[in-house]
Amino acid sequence: MKTVHSASYEILRRHGLTTVFGNPGSNELPFLKDFPEDFRYILGLHEGAVVGMADGFALASGCPAFVNLHAAAGTGNGMGALTNAWYSHSPLVITAGQQVRSMIGVEAMLANVDAGQLPKPLVKWSHEPACAQDVPRALSQAIQTASLPPRAPVYLSIPYDDWAQPAPAGVEHLAARQV
């Protein structure tokens, strides 16, 4: 059975987002598990540098860039560079790891208390899927939203236990969407 993890990587692959810019922490490890051989990971030592590299990559290539940040702390660290990306109209698809679903709302260590609000107003769209099965659709929507005029960064908070969950039936059409 296809997992949220494998379905999400297929969506990224089909949209050409095979370069991942990041500075991972524990919340991002399930996403990075079984990292595809046809993807490359650009490691930055600080989230500001990571977002800055992705911003430059998107501007130089004319294509969206994919960023994976560490929870709320990493998102906060990347906000200065996110400001530049916002004003440059860079199509960044930014994901951040979130605490496991059962810990959201109890202010556990590494939980982003109000994930959808944290990066605003520096993103065009910010979202945390309501359930694991909604992650592939939300990722597809993030890519589409970042890519459509006016291009701009988007943000998606993903609880780290979502990656191992079964993907919903019929997610294949999400990878085939074109802007």
Which residues are covered by each model-predicted region?
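N-terminal alpha/beta PP-like core and its mobile active-site loop of ThDP/TPP-dependent enzymes
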Residues: 1-179
